[in-house]
Amino acid sequence: ASMRRSPAHGSSFRPIHHGLLVEMVERFAVDAYGGFLLDPYYLPAARSGILQNHKALAGSAVSRATMAGIREFPQIPLFPGVVADFLRNVIELDRNQTASKRLERIPSVASFLEEHLTKGEIHIEAGKMEYPDILYKNQSGTFSLHRTSSMVSEVAPVVLFLRYLVGPRSLLIIEEPESHLHPENQRQMATAIVKLVRAGVKVLVTTHSDYFFQQLNNFIMLSQLTEKDRVSHGYSHDD
């Protein structure tokens, strides 16, 4: 766990709350790259659960807003800022669809993840009151995310953000992109991240996986080769 020194006790430490740490990292990244970026996008470690339950979470927030001052609600923790931003982005995904279709290189990375990881497509369809339904479609049929594997539900938010939101010079922050992925699939995720970097996206990741870290390190070493040499070793010019 990340720690900070307590001013009252020179040699003692106390843990930094996870939400505060995330806010600090995001603020540092935005301050550092702010002059070069269009928008920062953050994919929290809890992205799978939030995406599966986004309707219930948004509905609860709307209900509390419309009944404020009329009903008393039990005290519950507020969403951290980055989680609230993630939820807002999910709700507005369909509205951004047309604008981001022109960014071909980045949506192509979303298609790469669908081809090599999810083995099916992630769709957005207008639901009741035009609230988006997020669905998974493969050869067996069409399913809501809560009926898919943990791997699909973890990768789905990445696919959606790449297809509809992230653009060149954006900052994309992903917590634990290797979560619920087999080592071979971790390699494919690392490949996707490299493709994003080559498309002009600034990517910041946190990871607990030595295997995933090693894959990224291999790609850094690979970047020292010429494009011709990379292709001769079985890699594309985007790797």
Model-flagged regions — what are they?
Residues 1-169, 199, 239:
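Phosphate-coordinating catalytic segments in nucleotide- and nucleic-acid-processing enzymes
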Residues 130-239:
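Switch/communication elements of ASCE P-loop NTPase nucleotide-binding domains
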